[in-house]
């Protein structure tokens, strides 16, 4: 979902885009296999920048094997790219690495900026390892930008693919207390962030990939029901029930992360979808 949006945005700006995939079938697609550390040598020749979004989904049940896949897919992908770039005589100028707001500790009252971090637990460990791999490219002379992505709203995947079937039946509800913050962003705005980071040589470091305003889970759920013109009356499943059903993965559904977008405002970034209602209305 995110990759498709970024591809579309880059093409619209006149860029030639190459796609790394395990099974190349179309023109512009090149083979790679991060688990084996292999990549088509032609994939990176002549490119100006790399946007690394690959990683196993965190929205599947966290079995021991899937947790290994979540970590390995991010670290191995970055490592494969790093070795390929290190071997090049003429290197790309920039690497933009996806990251995640999971690096921030759970909080109901704090607003996190890019200077913050320190989350304990599995998600925090994954994000720290992910960003550390991205930072290695600086030693190769590349500009590095890390995009800590929040809850992406888009069609065909993400949180809406999970919520819409229930909400369209009028069976949607908040989760737990509903107090936890959801740092949402429309996928098209996220794609434009990637384009801006790739194009502007003055931008590097950490950036929160979130919209200009967060919403609590209760606000998000009620707004989604309103946009769909459906009732919003179902009682919220308690947090302990979610933990029983989802296991450790329940922390994704219940984590509270209120993130600042001030850094984007400061450089004049213009959001196409600056409020939750307009973002949801565009997608449903």
Per-region residue spans from a language model:
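Conserved beta-loop-beta element that borders a ligand/cofactor-binding pocket
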Residues: 99, 132-155
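NAD(P)H-binding glycine-rich loop region in Rossmannoid oxidoreductase-like domains
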Residues: 26, 31-77
């Amino acid at each position: 979902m995110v990759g498709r949006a970024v591809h579309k945005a880059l093409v619209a700006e006149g860029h030639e885009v190459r796609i790394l995939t395990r099974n190349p079938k179309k023109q512009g697609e090149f083979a790679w296999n991060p688990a084996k550390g292999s990549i088509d040598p032609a994939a990176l020749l002549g490119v100006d920048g790399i946007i690394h979004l690959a990683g196993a989904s965190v929205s599947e049940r966290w079995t021991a094997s899937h947790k290994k896949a979540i970590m390995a897919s991010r670290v191995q992908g970055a490592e494969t790219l790093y070795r390929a770039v290190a071997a090049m005589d003429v290197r790309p100028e920039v690497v933009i690495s996806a990251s995640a707001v999971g690096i921030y500790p759970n909080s109901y009252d704090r607003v996190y900026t890019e200077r913050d971090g320190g989350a304990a637990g599995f998600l925090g460990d994954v994000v720290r390892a992910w960003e550390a791999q991205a930072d290695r490219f600086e030693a190769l002379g590349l500009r590095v930008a890390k995009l800590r992505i929040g809850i992406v709203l888009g069609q065909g995947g993400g949180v809406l693919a999970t919520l819409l079937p229930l909400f369209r039946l009028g069976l949607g509800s908040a989760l737990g207390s509903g107090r936890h913050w959801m740092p949402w962003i429309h996928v098209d705005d996220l794609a434009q962030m990637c384009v801006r980071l790739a194009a502007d040589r003055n931008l590097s470091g950490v950036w929160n990939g979130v919209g200009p305003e967060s919403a609590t889970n209760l606000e998000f759920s009620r707004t989604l029901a309103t946009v769909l013109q459906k009732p919003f009356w179902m009682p919220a499943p308690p947090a302990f029930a979610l933990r029983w059903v989802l296991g450790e993965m329940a922390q994704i559904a219940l984590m509270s992360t209120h993130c600042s977008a001030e850094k984007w405002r400061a450089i004049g970034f213009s959001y196409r979808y600056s409020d939750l209602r307009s973002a949801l209305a565009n997608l449903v």
